[in-house]
């Protein structure tokens, strides 16, 4: 939905969220391809949903619930680095987002 205000076209938050999510999902696809990580259909669906939620939090400023860092001690440095690269693309999300996102990469790496 677009709204016109004094002649300027404004996108509503939902449209901005979708645009950001699609942009970042394109980056995720490229990143996965470069690292030869191939998620299965269910993993892809869950990853897509997570990235869309991240886009929502990025646009709305909605915070994550508190996350216990120790839950991610067994995540590989590679998966964490990939997740941090994606989180950096948003430009305004906390590092805890990378902790959560890294799980998707870690699980998908096991498909090889």
Where do the language-model regions lie?
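A cross-family "folded-core" feature that marks the main globular domain of proteins
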Residues: 1-112
């Amino acid at each position: 939905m677009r709204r016109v205000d004094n002649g300027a076209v404004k996108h509503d938050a939902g449209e901005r969220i979708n645009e950001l999510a699609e942009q970042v999902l394109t980056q995720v696809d490229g990143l996965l391809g470069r690292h030869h990580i191939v998620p299965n259909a269910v993993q892809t669906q869950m990853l897509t949903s997570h990235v869309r939620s991240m886009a929502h939090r990025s646009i709305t400023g909605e915070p994550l619930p508190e996350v216990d860092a120790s839950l991610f001690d067994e995540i590989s440095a590679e998966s964490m680095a990939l997740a941090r690269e994606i989180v950096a693309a948003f430009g305004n999300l906390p590092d805890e987002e990378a902790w959560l996102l890294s799980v998707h990469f870690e699980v998908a790496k096991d498909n090889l």
